[in-house]
Amino acid sequence: EKETLDGLADQNEMDRYCYYVAGVVGEMLAELFCDYCPELEPKKELLLQLSVSFGQALQMTNILKDVWTDRERGACWLPGTTLQKHGVLFKTLAPENGGEPFRSFMLEMLATASGHLSNALSFTLLLPRNQTGIRRFCLWALGMSLLTIKKIWKNPNFTHGSQVKISRRSVKITALATSFFAMSNTALKLLFKTSALGLKKKEIKTPLDSISDLTIPKKQN
């Protein structure tokens, strides 16, 4: 995609952008995990579907966190129709002038990102409980993404990425907590549910229709 302050056309185009830069990485991880753990083969199709959300959750978090940094260099990866719906003209918007329109826009975007994050957790919980290494790898990324989303949710009209950057202490606590509960799906669900209290979540159906022509095709038996 060419960098421009005009943004992306709509949410479908944002889905496709996120797929190209992150969703394919999620699919690659799903393939690698299935090759490494033969017991995952019966779940492979579901893993591949959820893996796209794994990538998009992380990418959307970065897009929202870096929205003003990207703007400084003339780039915008936000969906144009959603901006218009909330009355936001991002091309001429100064960070300090976001107001209620930009706040409501960001909250909608956070709900979408949270929906993908929920799918990403489901992806992670499908991994064998005894494979704590690959579980931790996924959980650390999801935990930090959730903390960032929560910081943006508390301050959607932030004017610089440093205002929503998570602390090193938070990173350490996230790594410790997710590692400690890595083998327990019940504990992990409770941990993420508690950490996400207050956040609205949009249900994301998989596979995404917007990228159905791009995803890895099912292998024929």
Where in the sequence are the language-model features?
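Catalytic cores of Mg2+-dependent Asp-rich isoprenoid enzymes
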Residues: 1-57, 69-221
